[in-house]
UniProtKB/Swiss-Prot annotation:
Transmembrane segments: none annotated. Sn-glycerol 3-phosphate binds at residues 106, 137, 139, 192, 245, 255-257. Its EC number is 1.1.1.94. NADPH binds at residues 11-12, 32, 106, 141, 256, 280, 282. This is Glycerol-3-phosphate dehydrogenase [NAD(P)+]. GO terms for cellular component: cytosol. HAMAP family: NAD_Glyc3P_dehydrog. Belongs to the NAD-dependent glycerol-3-phosphate dehydrogenase family. InterPro entries: 6-PGluconate_DH-like_C_sf (IPR008927), 6PGD_dom2 (IPR013328), G3P_DH_NAD-dep (IPR006168), G3P_DH_NAD-dep_C (IPR006109), G3P_DH_NAD-dep_N (IPR011128), NAD(P)-bd_dom_sf (IPR036291). It comes from Syntrophomonas wolfei subsp. wolfei (strain DSM 2245B / Goettingen). It catalyses: sn-glycerol 3-phosphate + NAD(+) = dihydroxyacetone phosphate + NADH + H(+); sn-glycerol 3-phosphate + NADP(+) = dihydroxyacetone phosphate + NADPH + H(+).
Amino acid sequence: MPKICILGSGSWGTAQALLLSSKEFQVILWGRIEDGVDSLQQDRENRRFLPGIRLSDTIVATSDLARALKGADIVVMAVPSQSLREVLEKARPYLGKDSCLVNTAKGLEISSGMRMSQVVEDVLGKQSRERYAVLSGPSHAEEVARNIPTAITVASYHKENAFLVQDLYMTPFFRVYTNPDVAGVELGGALKNIIALGTGIASGLGYGDNTQAALLTRGLHEIIRMGEAMGGEARTFSGLSGIGDLVVTCSSRHSRNRQAGILIGQGYSLEETLKQIAMVVEGAHTIRVVHRLACQLRIDMPICTACYNVLYANRKARDEVDDLMRRQKKHEIEEIVKRKKGW
């Protein structure tokens, strides 16, 4: 029976603890704030992030990193993307050399522009690549914790790791597919948050379903362009970790990025919005990296650029939407036009 350590006691870390403990695995849930972890351990409930859901008695919650990682066969990283490096550096002395590393964070590191697998390799060394996997897809913690049917993707450089994680997580309510495209799966999870901010902004401005559908669809084109430039496979973005996660993040009431966008569209500043959400909004960080990379690589990302301008360049959201609608006319899918000779 494997021992599983989950780093991160937020909503997603807690939901994964519930899922894995339902299979009678030994699960330790680590959180950095001692008072919060003590409350989890004593009350058997994550009142801040998943109120009303009882934790299994077999889940052990602790703020002691050494205790959490001791003897762990599987280490699940469920901390915010901007915290991953710091947590890994603290965890490194206690990590087993053969532990499988499962990342569930969705973002890009602001300072380096790295994907999460690259951050892991940078901190733990190249050998960590051999045991790394990323789990991503449309999986709001609020639904996973309540056993609402969910499907998701695991990617790894080595199929044995992917199969291991697939078997680990599969339940009658949680289906896991495998994919060898680590970069694509990571990028789909990171980039969709920007588009969700955009659809939220449109909703906050009072625009309807047509506008949001257009932003989602054209946003997918931007995700594919940037994703391919950063090493992902185009087909991956048509899967669960791509369009699947994009759809749920752009449309769900559980989506922090969409909710943040709505508030910004209603006129709140980014600072006011983040304070009101009171949880990590990954898209607000990822957009800074993507805007920088788009400029460096000269990749056309009009929706992402518009969102960046609203969040960080003091532009009015309605003006950015107007500018998007007035862009130079073009074909919808250039690749099809190129194949149609004489069109």
